[in-house]
């Protein structure tokens, strides 16, 4: 770990990373303070999660929480947000920089049963509560949630960007396949083998162009299409828009 964060800085890159918090030490927290821009801790509801958050905060590290929003976790998220607004003391840890909400996806260990539907009443209350209130930390969402957020009247559309896959980010698998997004890791429908192509060639390939065509062609009649571009082309069931066509 020390070697890679130092190497990043030497190359002019400010590293950020996400951790479960397991194995966090005061020494690692100090390295994060010295070399990292921010560290996100996944909200695993465990003793080591809380300990890592407090170690990072004590070291002066800009610390975020990554919270996966699913059918079974959205109610807890709403309760914690309400607690932080009304001051009842059962919210997120104090002095964090931000809570970033990540939409549950049915990939990897994620199950279809936990996918949130657009008409989920608790989820609708959750995003409307965020729309209407001010919190003691920043609120963020992953780009998968954008189709739901563009309908909120107090969220600046200029602060949102939809799916970045194949547009300004990509994912490299352990066996050197370039994918527009890690969600494609199982089917690898849009995979380019970096053993035979450079990253630039893969990025400009016909395979990646096919992936990007989704954003160009989706929902042509929608007045908000520039903000959403039809949402996720890999897992369409997570697109939170009742007007999608």
PLM features: residue spans?
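A C-terminal junction/extension of Radical SAM enzymes
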Residues: 91, 95-187, 227
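Flexible mid-to-C-terminal extensions adjoining Fe-S/redox cofactors in radical SAM and related proteins
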Residues: 177-178, 182-245
